[in-house]
């Protein structure tokens, strides 16, 4: 009997039907050994000896593997064709050797295949190789690095920053990206700018729009028109001028298809087009690779999904070209196949790109046989694969340059049409933060043709901060920086969310306060180890180990000597020094530019500063113990914000009533006090919440009060002198009114939930000098 060992039962089931009765295919159910989560699993002083354990969960599977291996003439290790798969095979072989006293490595045969089809499986079994110790060593080195960072840095975090959970080698760098982007957004100052649109009519009475580009031979830059007055003055002048078509430019533009999918581009495109998380994409892709029941048989529908290679096999290209010719015609088929080269930093090109194993299985032919989400992802992969071998898209571009009678003013109108749809016939790539304007046609125009100006429209704009990272754009950024590998992107994103370091809201990552604390600490005290270049450099070293160009324990020693010294150094630092640094680094985030926001909202004389307690970080008044105000900046599971110490509440959540849509409103108890919640939490989507101010007794909270709290920030009215709106809100430091972009604290003597417009204007008048100083 020949024993074949794979990772999963699904994969075993698919492969089993391709092999004869002499083979028995069983599953290891993933890794059978791992480093236990305790001190001493990696021993730097013993040349980085690694103490692996068989988990309780894996025990019964190991017993079955060992039992079957005793009866086998040979063991075929058929795990996935990457470092992780090689590592699983190595662990299986080591356990069998240990349990059965097998001495010869010839007993084990490594078989690797990129797709689970009969042809690929038979070829792999007929052409086995030995285990690649370089790949195994690279995986062991990665595992050791992650362990050494996690089990030395995390305990230090717990001591120096109570409430922080752990720090991972690669996850911490991804977290830094998210936090730094949030810093950019917080510090961003929006600037006003204007442009001028001209609604024009040609001699055939057809309308089109042009944009003003030059005034008196001066090109208009983004900030040439900076306010409404400038824009209106220019608009008035333009209305008195007549325009004509000065010059028409026509050209064609070719657009080439994107390469077939690799792991990162599949995750990005599935996020954009399908709304899938990276984790969900990989779970579905795994199933499509391992085998799906399509009625008459179970078959692997796509090639291996963890890859950074963009190549396709010659056989696959031939099949794709044949289908293009048959289904779309020869005009959609280039004269020669398209060959792609990877743009990914340090791409291994070890595997093919992700493609269907049989291109003739069209999405339509499988629609009734696949789960809805399976179908969507398969369709995406199929279309991208077909498109990558199709002809270019050809665009006709037209630029009409317009001029006033003396050429004092110049304008431009652009138009584009698709002359030949090429690969667009099948597939278009999505963009993360931009939209293309296509088929924006101009009416027929002639040079020197007089035009009528139907309208001159000034358009106000404001510069916008950089967007928060989506899953797609974060994976793209990690890939550009050379951080992580195809097998790690999904887990990086999942771990950050599981640790509550980031939240995913409206499909964008927002750092939680806990995540910002960790990032500030690591950047301040372990800067080298969260540098992007350093982390990418470690990935390069792991690649070199996999290629047999670097000894893995030498790489570990090089890392550990510096990292351990850094740990010992920070261990000696006083917590007060660390708190001082963290507060300084978070000062802008916590208080903004306004120094007055540091004043305690309770006593109005003390100053707020960062403190650390056993439950995490909080702000406290410098007048303690006379003033006991405190405000948590790291929320618990309920993620509510509240000032003051939590008051006593009944253990049960209280239903106050329902809103106008019939959604229940709860008064709930959190670790930092009571809060209002709209509806129940479903999955990871957080319902709307509002803290109950310390000035309110929770026993007096009515449905009316709860609805008011949930409605904040709320418009009070319009200031009679400026026609600017006045808003009331409740923030980190209590109630406030917002007027002309400035914030004014509402003192305790006011009932802020029922603040009148007159009282609001009175507060503004009292703070007039401060507001003018800020605006100056």
From Swiss-Prot:
SUPFAM superfamilies, sorted: Prokaryotic type I DNA topoisomerase (SSF56712), Zinc beta-ribbon (SSF57783)
Superkingdom per UniProt: Bacteria
InterPro entries (UniProt xref): Topo_IA, Topo_IA_2, Topo_IA_AS, Topo_IA_cen, Topo_IA_cen_sub1, Topo_IA_cen_sub2, Topo_IA_cen_sub3, Topo_IA_core_domain
Key words, A-Z: DNA-binding, Isomerase, Magnesium, Metal-binding, Topoisomerase, Zinc, Zinc-finger
Interaction with DNA: region residues: 166-171
Catalytic reactions of this protein: ATP-independent breakage of single-stranded DNA, followed by passage and rejoining
Active site: 304 (o-(5'-phospho-dna)-tyrosine intermediate)
Binding site for Mg(2+): 7, 80
Domain Topo IA-type catalytic: 132-568
EC number(s) stated in the UniProt entry for this protein: 5.6.2.1
GO process annotations (BP): DNA topological change
GO terms, molecular function: DNA binding; DNA topoisomerase type I (single strand cut, ATP-independent) activity; zinc ion binding
C4-type zinc finger locations on the chain: 600-627
Residues annotated as domain Toprim: 1-111
SMART domains on file: TOP1Ac, TOP1Bc, TOPRIM
Entry annotated with the keyword Membrane: no
Pfam families in the record: Topoisom_bac, Toprim, Toprim_C_rpt, Zn_ribbon_Top1
Cofactor(s) listed in the protein's UniProt record: Mg(2+)
A cellular component term, taken from the record's GO annotations: chromosome
Presence of the UniProt keyword Plastid in the record: no
Entry similarity comment: Belongs to the type IA topoisomerase family.
Stored HAMAP family: Topoisom_1_prok
UniProt function note: Releases the supercoiling and torsional tension of DNA, which is introduced during the DNA replication and transcription, by transiently cleaving and rejoining one strand of the DNA duplex. Introduces a single-strand break via transesterification at a target site in duplex DNA. The scissile phosphodiester is attacked by the catalytic tyrosine of the enzyme, resulting in the formation of a DNA-(5'-phosphotyrosyl)-enzyme intermediate and the expulsion of a 3'-OH DNA strand. The free DNA strand then undergoes passage around the unbroken strand, thus removing DNA supercoils.
Name the UniProt record assigns to this protein: DNA topoisomerase 1
Gene (UniProt): topA
């Amino acid at each position: 009997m020949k024993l074949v060992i794979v990772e999963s039962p699904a994969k075993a089931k698919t492969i089993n039907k391709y092999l004869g009765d002499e083979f028995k295919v069983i599953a290891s159910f993933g890794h059978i050994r791992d480093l236990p989560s305790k001190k001493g699993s990696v021993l730097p002083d013993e040349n980085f000896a690694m103490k692996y354990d068989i988990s309780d969960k894996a025990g019964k599977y190991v017993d079955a593997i060992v039992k079957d291996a005793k009866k086998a003439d040979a063991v075929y290790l058929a795990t996935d064709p990457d470092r992780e798969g090689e590592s699983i095979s190595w662990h299986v072989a080591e356990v069998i050797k240990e349990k059965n006293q097998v001495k010869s490595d010839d007993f084990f045969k490594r078989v690797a295949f990129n797709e689970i089809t009969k042809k690929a499986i038979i070829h792999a079994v007929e052409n086995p190789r030995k285990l690649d110790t370089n790949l195994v060593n690279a995986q062991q080195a990665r595992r050791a690095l992650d362990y050494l960072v996690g089990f030395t840095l995390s305990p230090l975090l717990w001591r120096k920053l109570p409430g922080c959970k752990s720090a991972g080698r690669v996850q911490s760098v991804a977290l830094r990206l998210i936090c730094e982007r949030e810093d950019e957004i917080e510090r961003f100052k929006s600037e006003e700018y204007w442009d001028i649109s001209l609604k024009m009519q040609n001699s055939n009475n057809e309308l089109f729009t042009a944009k003003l580009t030059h005034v008196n031979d001066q090109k208009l830059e983004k900030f040439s028109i900076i306010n409404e007055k400038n824009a209106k003055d220019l608009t008035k002048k333009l209305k008195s001028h007549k325009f004509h078509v000065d010059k028409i430019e026509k050209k064609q533009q070719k657009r080439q298809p994107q390469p077939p999918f690799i792991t990162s581009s599949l995750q990005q495109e599935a996020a954009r087009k399908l709304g899938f998380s990276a984790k969900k994409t990989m779970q579905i892709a795994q199933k499509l690779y391992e085998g799906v029941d399509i009625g008459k048989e179970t078959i692997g529908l796509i090639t291996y999904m963890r890859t950074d290679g963009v190549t396709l096999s010659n056989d696959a290209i031939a099949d794709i070209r044949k289908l293009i010719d048959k289904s779309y015609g020869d005009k959609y088929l280039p004269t020669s196949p398209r060959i792609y080269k990877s743009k990914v930093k340090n791409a291994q090109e070890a595997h093919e790109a992700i493609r269907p194993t049989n291109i003739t299985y069209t999405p339509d032919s499988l629609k009734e046989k696949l789960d809805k989400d399976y179908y969507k992802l398969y369709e995406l992969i199929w279309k991208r694969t077909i498109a990558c071998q199709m002809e270019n898209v050809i665009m006709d571009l037209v630029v009409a340059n317009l001029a006033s009678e003396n050429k004092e003013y110049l304008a431009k109108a652009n138009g584009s049409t698709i002359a030949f749809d090429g690969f667009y016939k099948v597939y278009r790539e999505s963009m993360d933060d931009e939209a293309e304007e296509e088929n924006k046609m101009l009416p027929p125009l002639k040079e020197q043709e007089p035009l009528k100006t139907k309208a001159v429209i000034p358009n106000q704009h404001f510069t916008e901060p950089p967007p928060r990272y989506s899953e797609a754009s974060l994976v793209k950024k990690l890939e550009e920086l050379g951080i992580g590998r195809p097998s790690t992107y999904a887990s990086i994103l999942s771990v950050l969310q599981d640790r509550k370091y980031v939240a995913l809201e409206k499909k964008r990552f927002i750092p939680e306060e806990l995540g910002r604390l960790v990032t500030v600490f690591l950047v301040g005290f372990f800067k080298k180890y969260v540098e992007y270049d350093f982390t990418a450099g470690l990935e390069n070293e792991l690649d070199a180990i996999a290629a047999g160009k670097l000894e893995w324990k030498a790489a570990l020693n090089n890392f550990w000597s510096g990292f351990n010294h850094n740990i010992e150094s920070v261990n000696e630092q006083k917590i007060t020094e660390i708190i001082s640094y963290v507060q300084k680094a978070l000062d802008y985030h916590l208080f903004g530019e306004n120094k007055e926001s540091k004043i305690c909202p309770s006593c109005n004389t003390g100053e707020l500063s960062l403190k650390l307690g056993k439950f995490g970080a909080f702000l406290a008044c410098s007048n303690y113990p006379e003033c006991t105000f405190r405000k948590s900046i790291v929320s618990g599971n309920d993620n509510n914000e509240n000032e003051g110490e939590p008051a006593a509440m009944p253990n049960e959540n209280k239903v106050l009533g329902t809103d106008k849509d019939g959604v229940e409103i709860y008064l709930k108890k959190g670790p930092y006090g009571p809060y209002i919640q709209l509806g129940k939490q479903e999955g990871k989507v957080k319902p709307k919440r509002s803290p109950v101010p310390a000035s309110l007794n929770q026993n007096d909270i009515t449905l009316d009060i709860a609805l008011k709290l949930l409605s904040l920030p709320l418009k009070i009215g319009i200031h009679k002198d400026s026609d600017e709106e006045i808003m009331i809100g409740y923030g980190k430091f209590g109630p406030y009114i917002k007027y002309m972009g400035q914030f004014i604290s509402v003192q305790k003597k006011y009932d802020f939930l029922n603040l009148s417009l007159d009282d609001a204007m009175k507060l503004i008048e009292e703070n007039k000098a401060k507001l003018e100083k800020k605006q100056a």
